[in-house]
Amino acid sequence: FRLRPEFVDKFTQTDIDGGDDGDKRCKFFTNGQSKDISSMTTETAGYLSEKWSNQKDDKTTASNTADAGVETDFPLFRLADVYLMYAECVVRTVKDKKEWDDWAGGSDAESDSRKQGAIYWINKVRERSKASDVWASNFADDDAFLQFILDERARELYHEGYRRTDL
């Protein structure tokens, strides 16, 4: 699959280059490829996704015969999806509650505590992929936090059939 440049931009150059410091979810084939897709008929236009490859754990190619089929496993429901859904629900709920509290003269303490819980689960997802932790101070407001969660869903769940629903 070719990846749109807008999606590639959700990762840093360190992630794309690989190595120990990069986000391990960034599985792009970039050798000889340009990031931009200038033409659909040019094979080298656009990075390619290696997320779903027909390789065994030892990196040898698995069978792909008419009788055996492809040996690529794929998840039906992932725990990372649950964690990110929870975080999104918290932020949306906190945002609505803050608007109510502002109108009614309430407190932000409970909302801040719930957001810390959401950040904990986001960081559990990021920990698995060796991405750095995020903190509440990374986000100017709830809208920025919500956008980060949607971008994190894109980074974590790409090519799993969720993105269209997320949009």
Where are these regions (language model features)?
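Polar, glycine-rich mid-to-C-terminal structural blocks
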Residues: 1-9
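Acidic/polar-rich alpha-helix caps and helix-coil junctions
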Residues: 18-167
